[in-house]
Amino acid sequence: MIGTIAVLHGREPTSAEIREIEAWKKPTGILWIRSYQGRERIPDVRLISGSSGEICHHELGMVFWLDPAQVMFSSGNREEKQRMMRLVRPGERVADMFAGIGYFSIPAGMAGATVHAMEIHPVAYRYLLRNIDENRLENRIFAGLGDCRELLFGTYDRIIMGHFDSSLMLDAAFEHIRNGGTIHMHTAGRNPPFIPEEYRDACRDAGTVRRIKKVAPHTWHYVLDMRAG
């Protein structure tokens, strides 16, 4: 559930499964999201029953406004949000290169970091601004609309790359990470990722991999942590 809407991924639900969800969760609507398209991660979505629209989702003491038919949100990333809140230290300068509606920017800001949140999708960016305001983080999170490669500036203690195509933009991340800083690169595949050969000399170790969730048959969402230096 995201707010009052049941959001389903993967194969199309059966009529029996839909009835079970309606009886158990009593959602205002059921959305089936086939996939997310392009860099803007626009949902390929079908409304199965009820209605959809803007909702308020509460998670880990944070507030997220969104329309799940227009922007991406994954409740399966809850543990990764918690991990960011544990890892981030007050005073850190954090870049969130694919901020979306604030999935990781809000937790980092709550942990006391100064966050530079970047998003290319105008609708997601609008919700990002709203969620910064709703969580009273205007003095910690500073948002920018556009291509993250053009918005990065200075150096950061931590860079979050929460997009499955983030490996294509590692050049930009390594240009802006401080010596000893950490890059969290999200990716999807059958097997755990590894640090690309061209970046191994820029890393202190072989990296740490976390498996987050299954996103398709034989395909998993992973996060690779890399320490620069």
PLM region descriptions:
Residues 95, 116-118:
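Conserved beta-strand positions in the Rossmann-like core of class I SAM-dependent methyltransferases
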Residues 167, 181-229:
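C-terminal catalytic and target-recognition region of SAM-dependent MTase-like enzymes
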Residues 101-113:
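Conserved SAM-binding loop of SAM-dependent methyltransferases across substrates and taxa
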Residues 75-90:
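Conserved alpha-helix/loop element of class I SAM-dependent methyltransferases that forms part
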Residues 170-179:
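A short glycine-rich, Lys/Arg-flanked "PGG" loop and its adjoining helix->strand segment in the class I
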Residues 1-3, 7-9, 14-76:
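Non-catalytic substrate-recognition/targeting regions of SAM-dependent transferases
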Residues 91-100:
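Conserved class I S-adenosyl-L-methionine
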Residues 118-158, 164-167:
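S-adenosyl-L-methionine
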